[in-house]
Amino acid sequence: MASAPAQQPTLTVEQARVVLSEVIQAFSVPENAARMEEARESACNDMGKMLQLVLPVATQIQQEVIKAYGFNNEGEGVLKFARLVKMYETQDPEIAAMSVKLKSLLLPPLSTPPIGSGIPTS
């Protein structure tokens, strides 16, 4: 007999704020900050390596926090949490601001080449 699918956790806006705040704080814990820094240094600002090295560490850090709120302890839980946050971003400016902060912790700043330093036109 197949087991029933796990119920997806639901959070109110207030609960989502709390969880998101805890996730952001988790990245400030010295051990986690060191893990992220090591992964970033190993990735050398290469986007492919960032996905291979930084994203898994960031996912683990988030999982440690969100599992206490009913999200599964696999990558799927982080995706469900991200979808929930995305849904609340439009309803709550505080969640929107925290979401931007979280993304800045996860993704490297995009560097664009200075204007005029691209391919020669002649």
From Swiss-Prot:
Keywords: Cytoplasm
Keyword set includes Magnesium: no
Entry protein name: Protein C10
Gene Ontology biological process terms in this record: post-embryonic development
Location in the cell: Cytoplasm
Keyword set includes Cytoplasm: yes
Taxonomic lineage from the root: Eukaryota, Metazoa, Chordata, Craniata, Vertebrata
Gene Ontology CC annotations of this record: cytoplasm
Species the sequence originates in: Danio rerio
InterPro entries documented for this protein: P_C10
A Pfam family the protein falls into: P_C10
PANTHER family associated with the record: PROTEIN C10 (PTHR13463:SF3)
Family in the record: Belongs to the UPF0456 family.
